[in-house]
Structures are given as C-alpha cells and as structure tokens.
A protein has these predicted regions:
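A short, structured loop/turn motif at beta-sheet edges
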Residues: 18-26
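Secretory-pathway/luminal and periplasmic proteins that interact with or process carbohydrate-rich
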Residues: 37-41, 62-64
C-alpha cells in the first residue's frame, strides 16, 4: 500500500470484508487496490502474528488472502478451499501437487500434526466428502436428511485433521 495508507488491525480485517462485500469477486477487486494496510501484533514469541483470510460465497467462489513480506498475495478461484497456518499458501499448494503426483492421495496421506500434512489430508478428505445423500451414512443421521449429513461430514473431517488441545510439536 502507498506510504500513509490507512491502517486496520488484523482482527478487524475479516469484519471489514464481511461488512463491505456481497461476493468474493467484489472483495478481491477492492482489496487488490490496497487502500489500507493490515497492522499485525507482535506475539509473546517476538514474532509478528500472521493470518490467512479465506472467504467464499454462495456461488462457491473462494479466495485466500495473505501478507508475505508485507505484500498482499491473493489466490482467487473455487479450487482454493483449504488453508493451514503455515507455510505460505504458494508452498502449501506446491506440497499438495507433490502428493498428487506421488500417488499418495489415493494410497496414503501424510500423518503428522504439521500444518503442511494437515493441509494435504484436509484437501483430500474435502474432495471425497459426499455432496449428495450417501446411502452409507444417511441411516446414521437425524431424520435421515442431507441437511444433517453434510454438517456431520464436515465435523468428522475437522476432527480427523485437528490437533488435540495442548499438543505441541
């Protein structure tokens, strides 16, 4: 952003996007103009807090925003649905490509609690979640309804890639 640009805090950045844009395309177009810069906080570790901002809309359009070395980087498209804390998003995508080419997605997946491994597992699992009523699972859902199956599937995905509270690498 230009010198002297307005500053907003890291914590208000998502709210700004939610309050001002109806679609991902609108948000991307406006944020590309870099009318402000996002001010981060310094954590107790002495490092600046980093954050990816991920948005999607009713059409399925998505975008991932992140600041890398002070510069806003935007990944825009329906394929950008998963993000973890680190590394930078371009590196997360490169790791995903490695696993696609290695054939690991259908045979084995990385299993550590590292963010990059969780990114690969989440991407794989999100791709295989049923988007329609699944005869395998529907009998175990309340009212045998997809409106219950879908959130149950998402919760099971989240639990399978989450790191237990208190666990440290």
């Amino acid at each position: 952003p230009p010198e002297g640009a307005k500053v907003i805090s890291l914590s208000t950045w998502p709210q700004y996007v939610l309050d001002n844009f109806a679609t991902v395309a609108e948000a991307v177009a406006d944020l590309r103009k870099e009318k402000f810069r996002v001010q981060t906080v310094v954590l107790g570790t002495g490092r600046a807090a980093n954050m990816h901002l991920v948005i999607s809309d009713a059409s399925g359009d998505s975008a991932v925003f992140e600041y890398v070395d002070g510069n806003l980087v935007i990944h825009h498209g329906k394929q950008y649905r998963v993000v973890t804390n680190s590394p930078t998003y371009d590196k997360q995508l490169a790791i995903m490509e490695y696993w696609k080419e290695a054939g690991g997605r259908s045979k084995c997946l990385p299993g550590t609690s590292r963010a990059a491994d969780r990114f690969v597992r989440t991407s794989f699992l999100l791709d295989v979640l049923p988007g329609v009523v699944s005869p395998t699972y529907i009998s175990g859902t309340p009212q045998q309804s997809f409106k219950f199956q879908a959130p149950m599937a998402v919760l099971s995905l989240m639990r399978s890639v989450g790191t237990p509270l208190g666990f440290a690498n």
